[in-house]
């Protein structure tokens, strides 16, 4: 991203860059045919489930002024706008936890002011959105995205940890609430007698922990040693939804003599009911908000604008990691401008705004990377085999494969194709020529193309558009959503919290504090973050304690009744602290590793034992044909490999060998550092 200096320069550059590939963004999806439906369904489920959970949380915190239907409507509307008019179509938008937190504080403030109250809550929130939209557009016009490089790992991981703790907090509050009488209900009803409340609470514990355990297990289904590959892949992609359906079905197996309302289920009005239709006309009440509160709305708008700017840019960064090898240009400035427009529309319609979300955005890119590689690999293998039947030379085979690659390269900037295929060319040309590692080996299209084909992503807009439409159609499925027990959602909140921890180096360093010196070698034996081998233990401890203290400050701010709306402020301050203060407290080289922009992982021990696979010397000793190995269900495939090298937030790991050859000496130094 170029550092544009003049106003509107970033937006203009982004718009012109994306305009050149806009037509191809649509054609690329149509060329994929029905295969585009697989990543569409995958990202639809990954996007819809959190929105349903957040919608239920929003409903409880705002006395049902907003809820699941409004959250789904916002996600669908903003998703459609962004997929059609946005700059980066791989970026997924939706209602996220920061929006829920801010709208909760707005509701608390509105209820405490008689001039506003519950009646004008959405109208005042609309004014907050108007100011937020103005600020976001100004940030885009003034090229504020040029500072995106200052969003380092420490801020992102602290924010992620805060959201994780708030998820767990919400799950605990929800479970405790299952034993209590809801605030808006009549406590004299039979369903709220002690024995039935206790029964409902125990069932809630079973359902929530049941979903948590099974969802976490299904999350890593691709690495299971049981089942066929297609089955493992299906469970890995859609396991969370399957578990939600499974535990919702289990909730109907309770004895029939339980009163209605045990277990408790989602309560949401039909989209055509009068209380739902009110949101579309909230703009009429905005004129009733006193002028003083219209001006006061600017204060929370500053916090929300900064929060959206940070979250949206980081989500876009994660969706466009350089390892994905994207060819179309970025559009940070333009997308922030579009975000401002979407926030304005949502505010006027009485909906909670949507912004870029993690991990859905990098998950979307990852699913399209697998699809594109499968398509390229299939066509290139077919062309290579066709040439081999014609007894073409190796140079002719490579030339034909390169033509296929160029033909499928949809980007207008396909000038580096030859350079990207250098490794494949070398492998093809050296085969049968007695050179390098391929000495004495015949060129095998299946093996060589798989090993040397560069990563490609099917950059298009259709999957984002279709998943947004599907999210919108969920609003019509209210009768089905009402069948979900609320306790299952508390389990899903806990699942989102636990699943977000792996790959968070702040969490990894916290665990390191509780490992005794004599057992630290266990960390080095497995896969571990690079800082473990590079940074002295004392520096790791000091940096972690600073981060822990700052996290407690951020979390403490969220407990301030009305002032909690300022919770994004510490994260803005942290950017300055990182740039000017931490540089003096820590060795710059150590700080660069601890706060690096990329996740680097060291290989401490072999991950797989080839003695259980049909490969290498074992295959040759038993005279097993190569075709048997290639068609074996036990081989690793693209999606499984991407799962292994991706953190839970969608961040690609840089995996390298240990920087120390003498392991025993390294352990000794590490234990005494």
From Swiss-Prot:
Pfam families: HCO3_cotransp (PF00955)
Protein location: Membrane
Ranges in the topological domain labelled Extracellular: 57-75, 143-160, 219-233, 311-330, 490-556
Key words, A-Z: Anion exchange, Ion transport, Membrane, Transmembrane, Transmembrane helix, Transport
Keyword field contains DNA repair: no
Biological-process GO terms, alphabetical: monoatomic anion transport
GO CC aspect terms: membrane
Membrane association type: Multi-pass membrane protein
Membrane-spanning residues: 36-56, 76-96, 122-142, 161-181, 198-218, 234-254, 290-310, 331-351, 469-489, 557-577
Transmembrane in keyword set: yes
Gene3D superfamilies per record: Helical hairpin bin
Cytoplasmic side: 1-35, 97-121, 182-197, 255-289, 352-468, 578-673
Molecular functions (GO terms): solute:inorganic anion antiporter activity
Top-level taxon in the UniProt lineage: Eukaryota
Function recorded in the entry: Putative boron transporter. Boron is essential for maintaining the integrity of plants cell walls.
Protein family according to the UniProt entry: Belongs to the anion exchanger (TC 2.A.31.3) family.
Official protein name in the record: Probable boron transporter 7
Species per Swiss-Prot/TrEMBL record: Arabidopsis thaliana
Name of encoding gene: BOR7
